[in-house]
Amino acid sequence: MDLKGKKVLLVGLAKTGISTIKHLDKLGASIIVNDIKDENKLRNILDELKSINDIKYILGHHPEDVDDIDMVVVSPGVPLDLPFILKLKNSGKYIIGEVELAFKLSNNPIFIGITGTNGKTTTTSLVGEIFSRAKRDTYVVGNIGNPVIDTIETSSEESVLVTELSSFQLESIDEFRPKVSAILNITEDHLNRHHTMEKYIEAKANIFMNQTVEDFCVLNYDDEIVKSLADKCNAKVIYFSRTKKVNGGVYLENNDIIIDIDDKIKFLNKDDVSLPGGHNLENCMAAIAIAYVCKIDLEVIKDVLMTFKGVEHRQEFVRNLDNVIYVNDSKGTNPDSTIKAIQSYDRPIILIAGGMDKGSNFDELLETAKSYVKSLVLLGETASNIENCAKNKGFNDIHIVKDMEEAVKTSYEISKSGDIVLLSPACASWDMYESFEVRGKDFKDNVNNLK
């Protein structure tokens, strides 16, 4: 892709946007940057981009007339149904995201693409660790926080790019083709962005739309939505399941993880897996399938599964104070993720939940919570919505708080020896925090300040 002298409109000045601008500049593109935030809110970012000469900014509003551009690159947080984006699309402008741009500019590394409503980051990190320990030139990139485009100068055909992909990123691909794709699960999420469940599923399925019979697609057999996508996939499908025996896949049999892709192999007892919970067992089986089809040594895979400590903000142990365990699951940004979190523990749970409203339904979460959760501590935009739903389910011990400091303090005061205080909000963080990472850090800081 030759971008020298081309006019490129970049929409969205987040982390991927900054990296994209720097690479577009190196390639000689003429850059127009648009962000809905104004100059004052973007001051630090603008300072970082001072060295770039051929750049124009349209800030605080979306552009009205940019007909003379050659290409549009959208950051993941930018909806593709914005009026000016639709106008550009209808006029025939080429619109892609950072992942697609990086794919086109790359030196043909091996892409592994991993998506799903939940478990993406853990599985991506797990696969990255497996390939790293196998001495492969490995990059862990994508939605996990490392822009894919930052690898284009250092990666080669021998490199492996383990890429976490959100539905937002998958909306804006065109020719992106991973050697191995994986869809871990699909449950209701981001309907404020995609509007319908069908559109959300369609975005997730984009991960395999360019794959051929020479590629592999790893799918969760236990997830009916995911399983139904197999008929649309041209790649060789490898299933994983913890409830059924699957031919040509990875499954659980008498507490043993079985690999049955070429020959049947009794691989590892599930109790030897270091990560807790049934959902993490599924993540591990997906990682096994990915690594196996890439011909990683089985002993390396086994060693990683037995020692991997997990990822920050994903059911992360914070502290044991007076025999009360504090757990940070700030990445639990939808009800299904929080259901999986509370089902991982056999102690009474004080659940801290609430955040930005994404249009989620909390009925199933609170129905499940009746068997696990003794108290609810609620904050953020959705606090009253969750409270009303909880009362309808018979919850009585509900506490509405104004911020994380009060949430932790209240949880501490009502806790008893043997309890778990679990931050798993079931909501996005953006009503109160810049990111789920900042929210998780605030929780940990407040927990560690308890005397």
Curated annotation (Swiss-Prot):
Keywords: ATP-binding, Cell cycle, Cell division, Cell shape, Cell wall biogenesis/degradation, Cytoplasm, Ligase, Nucleotide-binding, Peptidoglycan synthesis. HAMAP family: MurD (MF_00639). It comes from Clostridioides difficile (strain 630) (Peptoclostridium difficile). Its EC number is 6.3.2.9. Cell wall formation. Catalyzes the addition of glutamate to the nucleotide precursor UDP-N-acetylmuramoyl-L-alanine (UMA). GO terms for molecular function: ATP binding; UDP-N-acetylmuramoylalanine-D-glutamate ligase activity. Its main location: cytoplasm. One of its GO terms (biological process) is regulation of cell shape. PANTHER family: UDP-N-ACETYLMURAMOYLALANINE--D-GLUTAMATE LIGASE (PTHR43692:SF1). It comes from the Bacteria. ATP binds at residues 116-122. Pathway: Cell wall biogenesis; peptidoglycan biosynthesis. GO terms for cellular component: cytoplasm. It holds the Pfam family Mur_ligase_C. Belongs to the MurCDEF family. This is UDP-N-acetylmuramoylalanine--D-glutamate ligase. The gene is murD. Disulfide bonds: none annotated. It is an enzyme of class 6 (ligase).
